[in-house]
Amino acid sequence: MAIKTPKEIVKILNEYIIGQDEAKKSVAIALYNRYRRMQLPKQMQREITPKNLLMAGPTGVGKTEIARRLATIVEAPFVKVEATKFTEVGYVGRDVESMVRDLVGEAVRMEEKDQFARVKPQATKEANKELVRLLAPGEKREKRENQVQQMQDMMSMLMGGMNNQTNNNQEEISEEVRNQRMDVAEKLNKDLLEDREVTIEVEQAPKANPMSDMMGQMGMDMGSMLNDIMPKKKVKRTLPVREAREVLIQEESRKLVDYDTIYQRAIERSQNNGIIFIDEIDKIIAGNKRNSGEVSREGVQRDILPIVEGSTVNTKYGPVSTDHILFIAAGAFAESKPSDLIPELQGRFPIRVELNALTKDDFVKILKDPQNSLLKQYIALLKADGIKLIFTQEAVDKIAEIAFDVNQGTDNIGARRLSTILEKLLEDVLYEGPDMEMGEITITEAYVEEKLGDIIMNKDLTKFIL
């Protein structure tokens, strides 16, 4: 992927997020500093640590959206966690190190995807060979084994050879079968058998286990360890050729890639390019009246501190250093302020960005301008019913005005208010859409006032409905 400059990053963010220029600029600089650091000598690289960001602003103004879009802009491991999900060491719940384990897991998935793309041509070739064999099977003959051979195979399975199990049923290929396979291979190349069903054997997906999930929260990957030791159970599935091919390509790709290399690269990717977004960090600030719950909140801050400062976390893929991981924390800080965080943690987030509350003009832009704006989403949904939905400019202005007024009169939930209002406004259209014969519906200012006017006038209804 080509390296994007701070201006290019901001330009992409502008396609999805309205306003908040200061936050976009700070995030873009922090990301590009990653690239600058990698151009320096190794000794200097070790000295330069990321300048972590703390974003403060009301709910619904774009904090989470900025973080979410970062994952699509840079090919870097990215995880979003909520600070309220963590508990102090000694309490039941997720420990703070799990955010680093999640980051490495995401890096492994990204690296695996890259490696699978590299070997896909060869994996596709092998998958097609297997499809030919399944569509034109030969006569099977049982391979006789003595007890010693059976014992060796069993030990091989238990010691990790289960992924390379050999099929004890060998095939006898006659001239007739050979000709059939040539014919099938030719038809496969011409996509003539895509809808034909074929039965394949695939590894059974591991079942969810509440105990292993709890172990994972405690930092113990017991479920994965047991899955690696025990033989993989195979199940038969009957699928169309086009779907079976994709399943077989995945299985063949796993055989062709080197997972030790994937894990090593994933760890390096996490350490040098990883981004962890910690949301709701204001919710772990202790209040003025301290009780056991408040003490636990401050304990979570102290547990997060060494992770942000730089430490080594053990994962099932190997030890991971957090020295150069970029941390972005965010919170509404409605009942507290960033200076209420423990001083040590404040110092680890040197860049402070305040996001502004949204205005009526911002709401108008949010409705229309972003690449996948709310209005474009509803227009696309109704297009599936053959209906052309049109919003007049006056209607858009009225929707924005109502959203702004409701936010001012009740709880301010920012841009999220628009989704609630649009859902109520278009309720009848969405309900009757499939049965309508008209090809075009225009939403006017009068229609908006008719649908929402009574609710806006009644403050009690506004609180419950909008």
UniProtKB/Swiss-Prot annotation:
Its main location: cytoplasm. GO terms for biological process: protein unfolding; proteolysis involved in protein catabolic process. SMART domains: AAA, ClpB_D2-small. It is found in: Cytoplasm. The keyword Ribonucleoprotein does not apply. ATPase subunit of a proteasome-like degradation complex; this subunit has chaperone activity. The binding of ATP and its subsequent hydrolysis by HslU are essential for unfolding of protein substrates subsequently hydrolyzed by HslV. HslU recognizes the N-terminal part of its protein substrates and unfolds these before they are guided to HslV for hydrolysis. A double ring-shaped homohexamer of HslV is capped on each side by a ring-shaped HslU homohexamer. The assembly of the HslU/HslV complex is dependent on binding of ATP. This is ATP-dependent protease ATPase subunit HslU.
